[in-house]
């Protein structure tokens, strides 16, 4: 019998991530979501503001310098009668692996699209990842106070490229300098735009009913076009259907401007009303329901040095079932050990607080002294392994070299920790002492060198290396595997978790190897 306490808390929670192409305004909307949830008294805007007030969710040194969110932040705040867990994901394409994994820890996503640009490359890639679990998607068309594309075209593009039906919930009145507000199709209300900058939320004027004669004087140049346009839109677009939304087949669409603090609260209203409460999770052994009395959770991310004053690493855990209580004993399934966790933390973008309890849907941080890895499962006793937390094959490679050869030990330690954290992947060729670093984008290489220097006092540089790809190898036939390991020895390497990978200098070489060894599987992803 599930306790009333767990039932009530699961009912209240909504856990979601914000996904977008870089510069679509994702970090700004994160700020404003927190502002409307009263979690921030003063929302810091991102990049180029003279006030020295940095966005609250960007907190590693390099992020402060560049104005991009490199690591995933977790923020919890109350909104109406719900408790919202928001995971801010890196928008910069170079940090996509982290983002992919974060999407395994949420129950819904808010997709932010720049209304001037429409669907962009990174959004397409992220939507592919959400498709793996049919995650429900809410869409926010941002920057309506700038010159934008036609809203009908934007929705058509989302439907055509992302293969998801669009149901408009709010509709823009004018665009750019002529942006006057939005019309809420479900409530039949016109909400007039008044810009609020930073942490000011302006009182908005709401006029009930599209036929209200008051609109003739308030919107003399727009009301006629708006009524005509809406007639067409309502006739041609999809109605909101909650079932289809929960299956990831239809997205409610909102318009607004995050920088002007306008339209964000409507999205939040939709999110807390429609997004699913914490969902069940597939483990290898069985499906885990959130309302179980027994505790379970999995690690989807490890982050080093979140607090410059403490040289520590935090493992981020999604609670899947049961209840975490301070001091409880947990079974760390991979190591087989029972551990007592008394110092778990919750986050408010860089400000961490010790937590007494956590429920399904919550994200808690465990202090990690090198024993926890991405994909690890913790339970209150049962041997479970949650499925589907992927590692993706890197696309770019460099050899890393020390400026001071005596620091080899520190270099290895630093690289291993950074690879466990998922910041980068490390491969150690069997035939040499080289260290090959693999990443999904160039910026990751910069981050690694910078963090090796600031956190491990190691000066390192990169050298070019001819590697086309690195794929994990496995086989059901031990004899064939042994033969392969012997013959392909020069091309084999161990990754940070000691899994065997094939390092292909060219794609031609890889294709030949795949033909020559049909019993060996070459894999682009590896589950943690």
Curated annotation (Swiss-Prot):
UniProt keyword annotations, A-Z: Cytoplasm, GTP-binding, Nucleotide-binding, Protein biosynthesis
Compartment(s) of residence: Cytoplasm
Listed Pfam families: EF-G_D2, GTP_EFTU, RF3_C
Record domain tr-type G: where: 11-279
Family annotation (InterPro entries): EF-G-like_DII, EFG_III/V, G_TR_CS, P-loop_NTPase, PrfC, RF3_C, RF3_dom_3_sf, RF3_GTP-bd
Molecular function in Gene Ontology: GTP binding; GTPase activity; guanosine tetraphosphate binding; translation release factor activity, codon nonspecific; translation release factor activity, codon specific
GO biological process, one term: regulation of translational termination
Main location: cytoplasm
Any one Gene Ontology cellular component term annotated for this protein: cytosol
Annotated binding of GTP, by residue: 20-27, 88-92, 142-145
PANTHER family in UniProt: PEPTIDE CHAIN RELEASE FACTOR RF3
Similarity annotation: Belongs to the TRAFAC class translation factor GTPase superfamily. Classic translation factor GTPase family. PrfC subfamily.
HAMAP family (alphabetical): Rel_fac_3
Its biological purpose: Increases the formation of ribosomal termination complexes and stimulates activities of RF-1 and RF-2. It binds guanine nucleotides and has strong preference for UGA stop codons. It may interact directly with the ribosome. The stimulation of RF-1 and RF-2 is significantly reduced by GTP and GDP, but not by GMP.
Protein name in the entry: Peptide chain release factor 3
Organism, as annotated: Psychromonas ingrahamii (strain DSM 17664 / CCUG 51855 / 37)
Lineage: Bacteria, Pseudomonadati, Pseudomonadota, Gammaproteobacteria, Alteromonadales
Gene name linked to the record: prfC
């Amino acid at each position: 019998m599930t306790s009333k306490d767990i039932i009530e808390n699961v009912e209240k929670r909504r856990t979601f991530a914000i996904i977008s192409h870089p510069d679509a305004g994702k970090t700004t909307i994160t700020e404003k979501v927190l502002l409307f949830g009263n979690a921030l008294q003063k929302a810091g805007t991102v990049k180029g503001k003279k006030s020295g007030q940095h966005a609250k969710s960007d907190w590693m040194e390099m992020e402060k310098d560049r104005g991009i969110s490199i690591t995933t932040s977790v923020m919890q705040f109350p909104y109406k009668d719900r408790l919202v867990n928001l995971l801010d994901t890196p928008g910069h394409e170079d940090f996509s692996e982290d983002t992919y994994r974060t999407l395994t820890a949420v129950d819904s996503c808010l997709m932010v699209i720049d209304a001037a640009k429409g669907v962009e490359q990174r959004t397409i890639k992220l939507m592919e990842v959400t498709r793996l679990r049919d995650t429900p998607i809410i869409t926010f068309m941002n920057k309506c106070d700038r010159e934008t594309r036609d809203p009908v075209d934007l929705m058509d593009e989302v439907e055509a490229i992302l293969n998801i039906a669009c149901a408009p919930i709010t509709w823009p009145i004018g665009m750019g300098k002529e942006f006057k507000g939005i019309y809420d199709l479900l409530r039949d209300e016109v909400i007039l735009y008044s810009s609020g900058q930073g942490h000011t939320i302006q009182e908005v004027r709401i006029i009930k009913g599209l036929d209200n004669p008051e609109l003739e004087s308030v919107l003399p140049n727009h009301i006629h076009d708006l009524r005509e346009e809406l007639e067409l839109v309502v006739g041609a677009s999809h109605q909101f259907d909650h079932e289809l939304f929960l299956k990831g087949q239809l997205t409610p669409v909102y318009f607004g401007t995050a920088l002007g603090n306008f339209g964000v609260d409507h999205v939040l209203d939709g999110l807390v009303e429609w997004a699913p409460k914490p969902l069940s999770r597939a483990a290898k052994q069985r499906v885990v329901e959130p309302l179980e009395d027994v505790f379970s959770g999995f690690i989807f991310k490890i982050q080093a040095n979140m607090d410059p004053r403490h040289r520590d690493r935090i493992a981020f855990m999604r609670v899947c079932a049961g209840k975490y209580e301070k001091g409880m004993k947990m079974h760390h399934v991979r190591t087989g050990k029972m551990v007592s966790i008394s110092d778990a933390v919750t986050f408010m973008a860089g400000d961490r607080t010790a937590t007494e309890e956590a429920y399904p849907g919550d994200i808690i941080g465990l202090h990690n002294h090198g024993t926890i890895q991405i994909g690890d499962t913790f339970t209150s006793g049962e041997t479970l392994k949650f499925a589907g937390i992927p590692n993706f094959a890197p696309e770019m490679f460099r050899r890393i070299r020390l400026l001071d050869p005596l620091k080899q030990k520190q270099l290895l330690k630093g690289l291993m920790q950074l690879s466990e954290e998922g910041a980068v992947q490390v491969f150690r060729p069997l035939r040499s002492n080289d260290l090959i670093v693999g990443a999904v984008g160039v910026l990751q290489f910069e981050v690694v060198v910078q963090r090796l220097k600031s956190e491990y006092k190691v000066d390192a540089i990169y050298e070019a290396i001819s590697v086309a790809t690195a794929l994990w190898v496995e086989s059901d036939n031990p004899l064939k595997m042994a033969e392969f390991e012997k013959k392909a020895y020069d091309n084999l390497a161990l990754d940070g978790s000691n899994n065997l990978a094939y390092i292909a200098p060219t794609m031609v070489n890889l294709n030949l190897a795949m033909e020559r060894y049909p019993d060996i599987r070459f894999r682009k992803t590896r589950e943690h």
